[in-house]
């Protein structure tokens, strides 16, 4: 008799996605981050739901409602810090997941890659809005600075900013709409994740060698479910260590001060996971140019499949491309460090050099190195 999981319409869907899914036998731990991102999303939605039960999205009460959650709600301090540090872990997994896609050439699955980029944008937007909700100094000024970038758009910029703010400055209407969107977007992210998986399962997973693996597949369960559970346990160990031993390690002390429109913090900066893009924004002296560079720093990912000149999919056997890949990673780390520094010499110069190197590496050096490698292997 055929198993229920193979006949029941709902079970069949789960079976084809998580149990009998044919998976390459040689995928490494770098393929764990997809499931970890799913775990992050579940953690964020769950903790966020409990926080929303006690949060008040109004400029006069938001800050005190956060204090109330931390002090008076049972395990409120833990739920709050799990949510804040969960966002940091989410972005660590996200960056590693994208990095793996770049290294092993997973971007050749176009629909999966492009939905992934939309997911990245949506997650960044959700995280930014979440950062505004505690209504501390950095929340308020971060919201003011970043939303103000819309004013760089010709003709409609100023009207657009006032429309987003719901007034002539960041105030209660801004906070209310940001809370509404911050609550709603994770469910859109969940829907996009389902699409991402749907398109991935159309083509099947890539593997470290970058070659077709149709002749050598194994079932997802039990082999990769066990592997993913191990990854999940290590992830939870890191998250709980961060949350319980050093909950404020990645947050800004200024956010423990109530938002004050009359007092500007000495150094306005976003959360650490946006610092690389913030550094690129600040490295351009012109406002519109900076906004365009900021958008392009993420949108450049859409050009990667078109810039892929190599005859090999993966970088496993391409030492020249590997060198440029790690140069790009080092460059992004420098940009992240610079984004947290004040706007003064020598940081301005470093950020301009690092930003130029970022775009040059992706647009020119990597395609050129691929062509050189093809020529060296006489694959031209």
Swiss-Prot record:
**Chain positions recorded as heme b b562 binding sites:** 83, 182
The record ties this protein, via Gene3D superfamilies, to: Cytochrome Bc1 Complex, Chain C
Task: State where the protein is found.
Answer: Mitochondrion inner membrane
Task: Give the signal peptide as a residue range, or say none if absent.
Answer: none
**Other notes on this protein?**
Heme 1 (or BL or b562) is low-potential and absorbs at about 562 nm, and heme 2 (or BH or b566) is high-potential and absorbs at about 566 nm.
Could you say which protein family the record assigns here?
Belongs to the cytochrome b family.
User: Which protein is depicted?
Assistant: Cytochrome b
Could you tell me which species this protein originates from?
A: Pongo abelii
């Amino acid at each position: 008799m055929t198993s229920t999981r193979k006949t029941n319409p709902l079970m069949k869907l789960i079976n084809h996605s998580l149990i009998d899914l044919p998976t390459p036998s040689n995928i490494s731990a770098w393929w764990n981050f997809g499931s970890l991102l799913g775990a992050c999303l579940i953690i964020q939605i769950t903790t966020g739901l409990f926080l929303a039960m006690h949060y008040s999205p109004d400029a006069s009460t938001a800050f005190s409602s956060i204090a109330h959650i931390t002090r008076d709600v049972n395990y409120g301090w833990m739920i709050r810090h799990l949510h804040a540090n969960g966002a940091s872990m989410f972005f660590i997994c996200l960056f590693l997941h994208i990095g793996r896609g770049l290294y092993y050439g997973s971007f050749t699955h176009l629909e999966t890659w492009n939905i992934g980029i939309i997911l990245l944008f949506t997650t960044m937007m959700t995280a930014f809005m979440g950062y505004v909700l505690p209504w501390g100094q950095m929340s308020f000024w971060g919201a003011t600075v970043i939303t103000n970038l819309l004013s760089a758009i010709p003709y409609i910029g100023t009207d657009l900013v006032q429309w987003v703010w719901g007034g002539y400055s960041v105030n209660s209407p801004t906070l209310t709409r940001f809370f509404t969107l911050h609550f709603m977007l994770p469910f859109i992210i969940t829907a996009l994740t389902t699409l991402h998986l749907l398109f991935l399962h159309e083509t099947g997973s890539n593997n470290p060698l970058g070659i077709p693996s149709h002749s050598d597949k194994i079932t997802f369960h039990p082999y990769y479910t066990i592997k993913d559970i191990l990854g999940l346990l290590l992830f939870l160990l890191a998250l709980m260590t961060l949350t319980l031993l050093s909950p404020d390690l990645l947050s800004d002390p200024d956010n423990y001060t109530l938002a004050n429109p009359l007092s500007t913090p000495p150094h306005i900066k976003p959360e650490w996971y946006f610092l690389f893009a913030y550094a690129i924004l600040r490295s351009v002296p012109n406002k519109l140019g900076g906004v365009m560079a900021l958008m392009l720093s993420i949108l450049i990912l859409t050009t990667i499949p078109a810039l892929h000149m190599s005859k090999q999919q993966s970088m496993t056997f391409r030492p020249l491309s590997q060198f440029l890949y790690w140069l790009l990673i080092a460059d992004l780390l420098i940009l992240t460090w610079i984004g947290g520094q004040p706007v003064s010499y020598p940081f301005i110069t470093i950020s301009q050099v690092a930003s130029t190197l970022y775009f040059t590496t992706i647009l020119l050096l990597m395609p050129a190195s691929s062509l050189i490698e093809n020529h060296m292997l006489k694959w031209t």
